[in-house]
């Protein structure tokens, strides 16, 4: 593996921590006041778009499920409510089985480890710091940048070709 791969980029929720279900439940709770039919559409959209920024999901839900545009202030308020619902549960989430061992093996092999996540950057940094994971990763990146942009940036700055990144 180390002959060809020179770096590994991870998603975070559901890859490092068992936090994907926490976020699904936060979406459900956020839209519960709109009734079961709306909640099921929200859940389905969220699950079909894991790893995508929650703010993009909020805008899609407002337009396609609730039938109205979503202003910046409303989007920010939803983001704050979502974080309040999910943050403590994410901080308490267990590691995905095998994640800690895989990270340790990669560290021993000297392979740089990065995170590219759909979680907002400030929130992701807080989670990584509070879980003591900062030393595990060379860099941690979240939204508003999207994953393809993050990957291009990491590869350019670290002089990595696409076939050298897992």
Q: What are the language-model segments listed below?
A:
Residues 20-21, 52, 100, 118-121, ...:
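Alpha-helix N-cap/helix-start capping motif
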Residues 4, 84-115, 121-125, 148-149:
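Short, acidic loop-to-helix structural element flanking the phosphoryl-transfer center
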Residues 32, 63-64, 107, 129, ...:
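Short polybasic/polar patches that bind polyanions
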Residues 1, 50-53, 146, 161:
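Short, solvent-exposed coil/turn linker segments
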Residues 92, 114, 120-166:
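Substrate-recognition "cap/lid" segment bordering the active-site pocket of phosphatases
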Residues 3-97:
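N-terminal helical cap/lid subdomain that shapes the substrate entry/recognition surface
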């Amino acid at each position: 593996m180390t002959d060809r791969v020179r770096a590994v980029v991870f998603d975070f929720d559901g890859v490092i921590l068992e936090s994907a279900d926490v976020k699904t439940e936060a979406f459900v709770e956020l839209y519960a006041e709109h009734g079961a039919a709306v909640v099921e559409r929200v859940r389905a959209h969220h699950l079909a778009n894991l790893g995508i920024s929650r703010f993009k999901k909020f805008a899609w839900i407002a337009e396609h499920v609730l039938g109205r545009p979503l202003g910046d202030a409303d989007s920010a308020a939803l983001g704050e409510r979502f974080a309040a619902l999910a943050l403590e549960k994410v901080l308490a989430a267990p590691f995905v089985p095998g994640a800690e061992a895989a990270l340790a093996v990669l560290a021993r092999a000297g392979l740089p480890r990065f995170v590219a996540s759909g979680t907002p950057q400030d929130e992701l940094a807080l989670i990584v710091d509070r879980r003591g994971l900062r030393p595990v990763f060379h860099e941690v990146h979240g939204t508003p940048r999207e994953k393809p942009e993050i990957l291009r940036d990491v590869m350019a700055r670290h002089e990595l070709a696409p076939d050298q990144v897992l």
